[in-house]
Amino acid sequence: MSGFKCYLQLGDRLSQIWLNKYTLVLLLAMLKLLFFSKSIQHAIEVSETYILSNCYSIDSLYSKMTDNTPHYLGIMGNYLIEKGMEETVKATLETLSLIVYASEGLVNFAIDLYLGTYACLIVSAVDGTVDVATNITEKLISLVNDTVSSVANELDTGLNDISKIINKVIKAASKVENFFTGDDDDSNMTSSIKSVNLTISALHNLYIPSSINDKLEELSAKTPDFAQVKNTTKNLISVPFNEVRKNIKAVNASNIIGDTSVLYVPPVSLDNSTGICSSNQSEILAFYSILGHVLKIATVVCITVLICFAVGAMAPVAWNEIKLWRRLCGMRDHYMLSRQDSYTSFSSENTHELKDPFRDPPIQNGQYDVIASYQQCFQTWNTRIAGWMTNLVTFGKSPENIDPKTKQKIEWVVAYMTSERALCVLGIGLLGILVCICQFVMIALLKHKISHSLTSNDGDGVQNLLKSSTAVDIENQMSLWSVQTNKYINTTETNINQEVFGWINTTTLSVNNTVATMISDIDTTLADVFNGTLLYNPMKTVVGCAIENKLYTIEKAMTWIHDKAQLHIPRINGTQIKQALAKQTDNSTIPTASSTSAATENLLENLVNDMREGLLKILRAYHRITLGELTVALVILAVWLVQLPIALVILRLRLRKATFD
């Protein structure tokens, strides 16, 4: 037993190379691949079972999709046709109204162009003549009245002077006559002429009355102007056109398109004759059989490759162990040869006691081993675990009562079971067991939740949830479709108005600007030439009749074209479409609707039951997989426990060999 050590020798190390980390990883990968293959195989089987057990539901849904699609397409198509025809009639009536309005404008323009010009000139001539006569009369009356009054005043002044002279002459003659006759009787002829008073007071009352101007103004007021004549003519012409527009507005577009009930709507089919699943059941079975065969072959090939790599990984590990052991042995031999030169200065005078550099307590020379010190220094946890297990085995016994050889055997067996590779196996096994326990807890919680959540009562709630979810999804999709369609219509309408009618808008604006400039230039020219003269108003009237009225009419027509040259496309109303679908459903026969509802109820109930059963089946499958993983973890733990009999066998063989030696 002198050569027996408490640590593992090269042979002991090589006996555990199959527990190296590379081989373990590859073996675990192989097991993971195997479990993954089983999981896929189970999923394929569940899928096959689900499809075969729900063939009726699949056939029913497919039949509804294929057989009932014409029904809903018919409803949608009829609605679009109805709205399209109605909007077409409305657009036609609007176009007809615009044509009538344009025709009225053209007639008015033609009348204004030919007859209106002459009527305007005639009326303007009368108005101008009256205005000129009125102005001349006013000036003549003012001149005559002012002149006669002035002349009368001057004549009165002159006659007063003459009257004074004559009165003086008469007075002197009277005095001479009295002197010669001496007669104071005033009864004679001369006495009768006391004085002379010459006046023209009648001329002060001579004037031309202003009633003549009033007569002319009354004549001017009674003379109709061109605007009145034009409005009267326009009102007379607009009577038939207004009647036509009134009749057009009174037309009801809904009555013109006819009775929409004659539009055919394909009925809802309740016959699940289109059996896409039932008719192809043999092909479905063959397909799943091929999938299982391919999966099995792929699994076998991958596992074989991983096993080969796992076995091949032992060779480099064994070679590394041999090289490490050689280095340790070389270090030990080198230490044994140089220990006296290295540690003589630290020994006593009578002995050559050596000190272990890796331990604090003093030991005997024969007890020190470099390899043991190396393991204690660089494999700390392995050494500690080995010490704990040794103390556990020798529990209750003092170190002095244990035979040193027995202690070495125990330490060697513990070292064999707590080697780096053996502890790796132990850790993997314990970790696998812990993970499996966690998986069992999770599966139990999920199974409890499913069993108590998807009961019959809650199943109705799930069905209602599915119904409401389906209805909300359909409504959202319909709203999204209408919004996107309206966006497309908006873009198309904008492009048409810009690309097709854009040049019309540009042209009308340009023409209106040109007309406004021409009218402004004409008015400026007339003001520069005739302003302040009697000819300004007549010339302005003549130019207005001949030119400006036509320009104003053109400007008004261009503005009308600019406002009306716009395309308005009707928009999609999702609410009306939904109401049309609901109305069509209400108008359907009651047995058909109730049968469809009952079939839908059955489908939803089957869906809930299949959901519950499918979830439980998946949990059962994962329970089986977890059991397999737990078995693998226990096997790995058993592999570590197998190290004990292997260590005992090796120890037995080594002791027998030492006995023979």
From Swiss-Prot:
Keyword Membrane (UniProt): yes
Xref: PANTHER family: PLASMA MEMBRANE FUSION PROTEIN PRM1
InterPro entries, per database record: PRM1 (IPR026777)
UniProt topological domain (Extracellular) ranges: 1-16, 127-296, 446-629
Source domain of life: Eukaryota
Entry's localization field: Cell membrane
Name of the molecule in the record: Plasma membrane fusion protein PRM1
Transmembrane segments: 17-37, 106-126, 297-317, 425-445, 630-650
Membrane topology classification: Multi-pass membrane protein
Keywords: Cell membrane, Conjugation, Glycoprotein, Membrane, Transmembrane, Transmembrane helix
GO terms under cellular component: fungal-type vacuole; mating projection tip; plasma membrane
Cytoplasmic side: 38-105, 318-424, 651-661
GO terms for biological process, alphabetical: plasma membrane fusion involved in cytogamy
Function, in words: Involved in cell fusion during mating by stabilizing the plasma membrane fusion event.
Signal peptide: none
Induction: By pheromones during mating, through the regulation by the STE12 transcription factor. Also induced in respiratory-deficient cells.
Main location: membrane
Annotated glycosylation sites: 135, 145, 188, 197, 231, 252, 272, 280, 490, 505, 512, 531, 573, 587
Protein family (similarity comment): Belongs to the PRM1 family.
